Design a protein with these regions (language model features):
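Hydrophobic/basic alpha-helical segments
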Residues: 1-144
Length: 144
């Protein structure tokens, strides 16, 4: 794991790295769907795909680079493999059935958890110097 940022301050390299990891996992999921039940494939997804999507997503998840579309496509492929669905099956119902968040919802959830940890004063000390709650309950002061 790690975050890859290129000389142009673009997240494209990092997102391509995540796509490559998910592609490798998709191969494993595709092979497993012939032999193991859905709950085991979901565990494999949670072990091999989900950590790469979640890692530092607050930093790179709002990137508008071309790689984000490919990443979303790769996640959909992984979901179809977990659910043993056809290659053109609509993914939204599968996400609900499997109780898995798509990339966009993962970003929202991780961001909400981060903001919650700011207000509950549960950040590491290195972050506490940057994010300081103000008197207002609705404002977070960012000091740089």
């Amino acid at each position: 794991m790690g975050v890859h940022l290129d000389e142009n301050m673009s997240w494209e390299h990092h997102i391509n790295h995540v796509i490559n990891k998910i592609s490798s996992s998709n191969y494993a999921l595709n092979q497993l769907k012939k032999f193991v039940p859905t709950n085991i494939r979901k565990t494999v997804y949670n072990s091999l795909v989900k950590p790469h999507i979640e890692y530092a997503i607050i930093s790179w998840g709002n990137s508008k680079c071309e790689g984000m579309k490919r990443l979303i496509t790769k996640q959909k492929q992984a979901i179809r493999n977990v659910a043993n669905a056809k290659f053109n099956a609509h993914v939204d119902p599968l996400l609900g059935t499997l109780k898995i968040l798509n990339v966009e919802d993962t970003l929202k959830c991780c961001t909400a958890e981060f903001v919650k940890s700011i207000f509950l004063d549960k950040l590491p000390n290195s972050f506490k110097q940057i994010f300081k709650p103000m008197n207002s309950e609705r404002v977070v002061k960012l000091t740089v």
